[in-house]
Amino acid sequence: MNIKAYAKINISLDVIGKREDGYHLLKMIMQNIDLYDIVQVEKIPNGIKLKCNKPYVPTDERNLAYKAAKLFKETYDIKSGIYINIEKNIPVSAGLAGGSTDAAAVLKIMNKMFNINVPQSELMDLGLKLGADVPYCICGGTALCEGIGEKVTKLKPFTDKILVVVKPPFGVSTKEVYKAFDLSKVIFHPKTNELISNIEKNNIDFIANNMKNLLENVTLGRYKIISTIKEEINTCGALGSMMSGSGPTVFGFFDDILKAQKCYEKMKEKYVDVFITRTI
């Protein structure tokens, strides 16, 4: 059994507090894009085996999809072994939830495959044990995510918006970015409620001009290339550009497919991981 595991971007990312255990309290708008891994899960006699088409992706317990299979097996007392194959297209350590979306796919497939059929809400609770983005990845679409990511509220779908996505040639540790984040230095927070009402109105201009990610405060300071990519995308005629998640990936919204195509071609001359895609 296989499914597409979609990447996400953040239309906004606000940090509103910090828990005693060190986790940051977030308020963010998440959006799936038409860039995906293909995750296949099959039954085998015993154990967990994972294969991936990209050699730099770990195939042991360091992989979130492996952890998802192990957690599901333990939670629902599954005796069968599991074989996972990941055809990886989403860049890793990119701020696109590549690991989380694969883990979510494994949970969804195993839920059906073994006829456990727990409701989506229970699967999301399980996913939270793996990572803050996993509950959203189980749910997908356009959503407001709050708490540490566990509270997911579906929003009106913001589909078919053209975007160019560029990942610089390095990864960023989400943990390190949050560790360096200083909430006391934040002056302007994202206009989350206004963004939501303009998503409902399908107002791409407002979204592109007002989207905001507070983690840029950390990552842009460390990597000047991210600001450069944002400027390059804007120069190509984007309505607006922003870093996704903890970075380093940057995306720009376009209202013209030809401008987006030209931007894609221009960025492809300098960077390996460049995609032209749509919101779904």
Swiss-Prot record:
What keyword terms does UniProt attach to this protein? ATP-binding, Isoprene biosynthesis, Kinase, Nucleotide-binding, Transferase
The pathway it acts in is:
Isoprenoid biosynthesis; isopentenyl diphosphate biosynthesis via DXP pathway; isopentenyl diphosphate from 1-deoxy-D-xylulose 5-phosphate: step 3/6
Q: What is its EC number?
A: 2.7.1.148
The molecular function terms of the Gene Ontology recorded here are: 4-(cytidine 5'-diphospho)-2-C-methyl-D-erythritol kinase activity; ATP binding
Q: Which reaction does it catalyse?
A: 4-CDP-2-C-methyl-D-erythritol + ATP = 4-CDP-2-C-methyl-D-erythritol 2-phosphate + ADP + H(+)
A single BP term in Gene Ontology = isopentenyl diphosphate biosynthetic process, methylerythritol 4-phosphate pathway
Broad EC category = transferase
Active site residues per record? K8, D133
HAMAP family reported for this sequence: IspE
Query: Which purpose does this protein serve, as stated in its record?
Result: Catalyzes the phosphorylation of the position 2 hydroxy group of 4-diphosphocytidyl-2C-methyl-D-erythritol.
Family per similarity comment: Belongs to the GHMP kinase family. IspE subfamily.
- What's this protein's name? 4-diphosphocytidyl-2-C-methyl-D-erythritol kinase
What is the native source organism of this protein? Clostridium botulinum (strain Eklund 17B / Type B)
Name of the gene: ispE
